[in-house]
Swiss-Prot record:
This is UvrABC system protein C. It comes from Clostridium botulinum (strain Langeland / NCTC 10281 / Type F). One of its GO terms (molecular function) is DNA binding. It holds the Pfam family GIY-YIG. One of its GO terms (cellular component) is cytoplasm. Residues 204-239 form the UVR domain. The UvrABC repair system catalyzes the recognition and processing of DNA lesions. UvrC both incises the 5' and 3' sides of the lesion. The N-terminal half is responsible for the 3' incision and the C-terminal half is responsible for the 5' incision.
Amino acid sequence: MFDLEYQLKNLPDKPGVYLMKNNLGEIIYVGKAKILKNRVRQYFQKSQKHSEKVKAMVKNIEEFEYIITDSEIEALILECNLIKKYRPKYNILLKDDKHYPFIKVTLAEDFPRVVSTRKVTKDGSKYFGPYVDGSSVKDIIELIKKTFPIRTCKKNIVEGAKAIRPCLNYQIGLCKAPCAQYIKKSEYREIIDDVIKLLSGKHLDIVENFKLNMERAAENLEFEKAAMLRDKINIIEKIGEKQKIILNNFDNEDYISLYSDGKDTCFQVFFLRNGKIVGREHFIIEDTFDTNSSTLISNFLKEFYGGTAYIPKTIYVPNIEDEALLEQWLTLKKESKSTIKIPIKGEKKNILVLVEKNAKTTLENFKLKYLQEKALYDNVLKDLKNILRLQEEPIRIEAFDISNIQGFDSVGSMVVFEKGRAKPSDYRRFKINTVKGADDYKSMKEILTRRFQHGLSEIKSIQDRKLEFSSGKFSVFPDLILMDGGKGQINIALEVLNTFNIDIPVCGMVKDNKHRTRGLIYNGEEIIINKYGSVMKFITRVQDEVHRFAISYHRSLRGKNSFHSLLDDIPNIGEKRKKDLLFNFKSIDNIKKATYEELLSIPSMDKKSAECVLEFFK
């Protein structure tokens, strides 16, 4: 039994991290403190004026634990790591934990490549970015590949190594084939230097050089070469237009502000690179209530920059808590100086005002759309409750479907809708294990049995404090089950539920002869729902989604299996021998018919491997 009063009295006079837990043992909040005893006790002092969010959290605190650290900066680093690990309910959590893409030039390699990455490391490479729009990175890299003959393979190519046969890219002029040692390291590096110039905003120098070569080619009547250079000039100029870059000797700035309406908050981030706004991002955090803006921004910075690969040179905010500590943390992460500034007037202040205005507009538009959707979904759930005569509105709905082709690779899918909205994070896939051939009823029985067995097992683990509630994949049960089928599928579901003594209403979604949603089957009778337009659309959407999810899983399994060959199952037949056998015999059937002598005639085959093939196909 946790003795709250005793634990509060014995809190240490040291820096550290505290973890608040609810009655299920779940971590609902992680915080850091300069002095643990002062900070943790504040939550339980009635004299303290807490925000509504903190009051709601304190009501749910059943116990807490703490970790002592040597310094406040260590506590901050640990706090960020624990928030990322546990995703506590009452911490500010960004639903979109983005790592923005960069263009990476792998300068540590003898023959560098140009690739996209979301992780910046000290590996000797040169990075350009981040790019808020991922498609821009893809477009720029594709244009670079068309313009500069650089390699795209992942091979470890070293100058002076054994030459290998070049790929098709060499044949069509897209690569200089360093793998075949057709180009020296120094010559290849000259090409890479041009790529770096282009990505560094110095494309005009390259264009000038290409124009001179184009004019020379035209004077020498080499019109094809001149046309090719003209096309490359157009591509380079296009990259120059697209390229919004980071240069180490220019200002790289993020502007962060927020707007709160008393309940929810919208954070808006503007990214400025080389004096230009190259992108923006917003994050809406619900139920912040009356938490002060400096606390919100401090918590937002920890979450946002804890999950991004790039930290700018300067971050501008309207106000903030723990400014010096956060600067120290950002500098440690960046491995070079990063500064937080609060502008009072001038251009920087004006940009922050613009950022706040955008946050306000974004939140208002979100609320308007949310309220419209909420009203629509509320009506759908009310109508569904009335149509089926349910006791409560079906807040959580689970739908199930089976997919197979002629009995092969049977799979099951479960999709979830909460409050009328799809909840992909709760979707589940099942590979059928116990059923041979195409038997949808037995397959459905298997996946439903597994779903509720897992659920009951998780609930017991949660009750025994062996599993956190938020970690459960099946512990939340639905208010309504929708089966993609008629009475047969409904009966299977009811049979499984009765086995586990679970009482959940089950509906069947039926289609007409044109495979369009027709109605629902419930309690043995069909209910026509076409007069309920919004319900009809909702059921159709659920039916289409569960079918799509099942089909996509089935295709992915088929795709994996399509790469498997019978030859993979033969002992002593590796990738090389498999390729040689198929190249010489053209098909599996011909390999089956091959004699011992014919198999041995393949250079990579020996007596043992030939015997293995004959034994396998005997």
